[in-house]
Amino acid sequence: MSEFTLEPLYDYPQREQVLALARTHASAVDRGERSPFENLREIAKDGLITLGRDGGSLVPQVSVAFDLATEDASTAFSLWAHRSTIAFFDAVGRELPEGLADATVSGTTAMAAAYKEASGLAPIKVEGTLVEGGLKLNGSVSWASNLYPGGVIVLPVAVQNAPESHPNRYIVTVRQDVEGLSIDYHRNLLALNGTESGTLKFEDVFVPSEDILSDNIEAFLHDVTAPFLLVQSSFCLGLAAGALQEAAKHLDVSQGVFRPEFPLILTEYQSLREELVRLASEPERAERRDLLSLRLGVSHFATIATHFELQVVGGAGYVATSPTARRLREASFLPVQSPTEGHLRYELARYDHLENLRDAL
């Protein structure tokens, strides 16, 4: 008999409470009736959203995101965006804005455009003009999440009037309710309705000089990519693990016809799990190619795992409000989450191309 035990990536004293909290409120969060930040504020009391800030192992932090996602991917997603925002301030040696460490203030990463421009896929769409005392911002960010009143947003800006030979790409922070910033919220999503996602529109938004976090975007991205992708990958894998846990209960369906596939799926799961732990153990040494490959791999695997769960659970899993259906919907978001499937495949193809060139030479 094939079995699956949901083992922690890293065991910590509050793990059972984290799982129970996520399980209890998963349906309400999915319906948009409860904010994921209500869950994050609970676990923040035990310091579980600020783990690994000393520059050491990220395994404890990715473990929390993984565990949340086995029961509720929306809360795990919100943790990823919030924890990434914390990492942005840490990368430039800034103190965290008040409320970020305990999740009484939300953190929003609007960094997709920075990664896209760095890869040659698309330009940064928020433009900045240097003015006395800071910058004026105009433009838009097509998608960001955790958009709560008073929240902290970090984003890249293309500076239009930077002096010659000076940097013209900045990383800045603004508050969600700053004058000139409007939000068009995305409602009735296929999944993750509780994540307060929307489009940001900037119209002459003033950013004081002290809120410019960096004018070295290349170095900034280098420093934040590992925590950004590792916590993201962990909740993708946690979502898949939740599907496998449920699927394992139904392997005798249809006279066990699906049973031979399960060990093969578990082998891939174990491989991805080991790679996640390896990279998170020493994030500063993680190679970018490995991080991108892991992120793409766990996204694909979540799709495989959730579809397998639906196959073995059967009609009960097709009920829209069931945990099986919720996981299937949540997994459908992963290919469009930044970095998108297209972005990941494009970057990895470039690595392959360079490798082929080296081999040819």
Language-model features and meaning:
Residues 23-30, 52-53, 252, 270-300, ...:
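C-terminal helix-coil-helix/basic helical segment that borders enzyme active sites and/or dimer interfaces
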Residues 34-140, 145:
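Glycine-rich flavin
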Residues 1-55:
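A generic N-terminal leader/anchor concept
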Residues 143-181:
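A short core secondary-structure module
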Residues 59, 130, 210-218, 314:
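Acidic-glycine-rich active-site phosphate/pyrophosphate-binding loop
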Residues 316-361:
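Glycine-rich phosphate/cofactor-binding loops in nucleotide/flavin-utilizing enzymes
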